[in-house]
Amino acid sequence: MSNGIVIIGSGFAARQLVKNIRKQDASIPLTLIAADSMDEYNKPDLSHVISQGQRADDLTRQTAGEFAEQFNLRLFPHTWVTDIDAEAHVVKSQNNQWQYDKLVLATGASAFVPPVPGRELMLTLNSQQEYRACETQLRDARRVLIVGGGLIGSELAMDFCRAGKAVTLIDNAASILASLMPPEVSSRLQHRLTEMGVHLLLKSQLQGLEKTDSGILATLDRQRCIEVDAVIAATGLRPETALARRAGLTINRGVCVDSYLQTSNADIYALGDCAEINGQVLPFLQPIQLSAMVLAKNLLGNNTPLKLPAMLVKIKTPELPLHLAGETQRQDLRWQINTERQGMVARGVDDADQLRAFVVSEDRMKEAFGLLKTLSM
C-alpha cells in the first residue's frame, strides 16, 4: 500500500501543490502537517489590513476542514514536526509519526528581527497568526515605527499612513527598496511617501527599544530617540531550514534544490519560501505557482525541469504602485528613466543596450507586459 505524499506546511506553496496534484491524481494519499490552523488566507493582504480595518479572522478564505474535504486530504493542524528520519521515510512529531513515499518541505520563511536590546518589543506581520497576536496593539497605536525600507516595509508604511497613523520608517540604506533597485528609480515612491507624511530616517540605525509608561522608546544612532506605540520589523525573511538541516539535507540560504525541486535526498523535495532553487531564493507568488506545477508532475512520476520566465514583481503601494522585472539590482546597468505626470518607465540596459530590467509605475504599468516580452527574448 502506498504511503503517498507528505507535505510539511500549509501556506500558499503547499496549497498550490495540492491543487496541482489533485488535477492529475484524485486518489494518491496526501497528508499535510503544519504548526498553524491551516485555514487559507491571502498573505499579501497583510500589507493592507490596517487601512482596510480588517481583523485577522476577516482574512480567512477557506477553513482547514473545507480544504481537506475539497481535495481529499489528511490534515494535522497545530502540529510541530520535530524530526525527519530520511532513511526510514518517517516524519515525527511529539505524539505521532507518518510514513511517506515522497516528502515535500513547504515550511516557508520567518521574519528576521534585528538583534538589538528590546527586540522582544518588535512585532512581525508575516502570517495571519502573527497579525492575530498583535492586531489590537496595531489598531490602537497612533505612532508606528517600521524597521526596514524594503518591499514589505514600504507597503506597510503607506498602509499605516493611509490609516491616519504617524509613521516613521528607518533603514540603514540611503534609499528605500535599496536591495531591489537604484535610488534614481525608487525616488518617485520615496517622494510620495514623504508627501503623505511618512518620516523617513535613511542611513540610520535602530540601536535599542525600551518600554516606557507612555509607549516604546526607540534609541537610534547619532544620539537620537523617538517614542512610538508600536514597532514592526520588516527587515526581510529567513527561510525555515532547521528541520531540513536536522534531516541531513544540503542547506545554503534555503533548502538547496535542483531544477526538479529535489533536495540532496532523492525522496525529499522543497517548495516555496524555504527553497533555494539552483542558488536562488524566490519568495514571490509567480515562481511558487510555476514551481508547484512542475513539482506536482515530478511527484507523480514525471521528470520535468523548472524553467522560469522573466516575471513581474508587484509592489502594492496603492498611492503609487510599482511593477518590476528582470535584474533590477544589477550594479552595472544604465537606467533610462522616462517620468511623466501619469507615471514612470525606467529601463535598465547593459553595455550592449540590451534590456535587462525595468520598473513601471501608476498608469504606465500597462506597458509592463510589452517590456516583459522584450525581456524574455
Curated annotation (Swiss-Prot):
Q: Which co-factor is required?
A: FAD
For this UniProt record, give its keywords in alphabetical order, as a comma-separated list: Cytoplasm, FAD, Flavoprotein, NAD, Oxidoreductase
- Asked whether the keyword Cell division is assigned, the reply is no
Which Pfam families does the UniProt record give? Pyr_redox_2 (PF07992), Rbx_binding (PF18113)
Q: What is its main location?
A: cytoplasm
Enumerate the catalysed reactions: 2 reduced [nitric oxide reductase rubredoxin domain] + NAD(+) + H(+) = 2 oxidized [nitric oxide reductase rubredoxin domain] + NADH
Which top-level enzyme class is recorded in the Swiss-Prot or TrEMBL entry? oxidoreductase
Record-listed E.C. numbers: 1.18.1.-
GO CC terms of this entry? cytoplasm
According to its UniProt record, in which pathway does this protein act? Nitrogen metabolism; nitric oxide reduction
Q: Which InterPro entries match?
A: FAD-bd_OxRdtase, FAD/NAD-bd_sf, FAD/NAD-binding_dom, NO_rdtase_NorW, Rbx-bd
Named from the GO MF annotations, one term is: oxidoreductase activity, acting on iron-sulfur proteins as donors, NAD or NADP as acceptor
Cell compartments where the protein resides: Cytoplasm
Q: Which residue spans adopt a coiled-coil conformation according to this UniProt entry?
A: none
Q: What does this protein do?
A: One of at least two accessory proteins for anaerobic nitric oxide (NO) reductase. Reduces the rubredoxin moiety of NO reductase.
Please name the HAMAP family in this protein's record. Answer: NorW
Q: Which family does it belong to?
A: Belongs to the FAD-dependent oxidoreductase family.
Name under which the protein is recorded: Nitric oxide reductase FlRd-NAD(+) reductase
Annotated organism of origin: Escherichia coli O1:K1 / APEC
The organism's taxonomy opens as:
Bacteria, Pseudomonadati, Pseudomonadota, Gammaproteobacteria, Enterobacterales
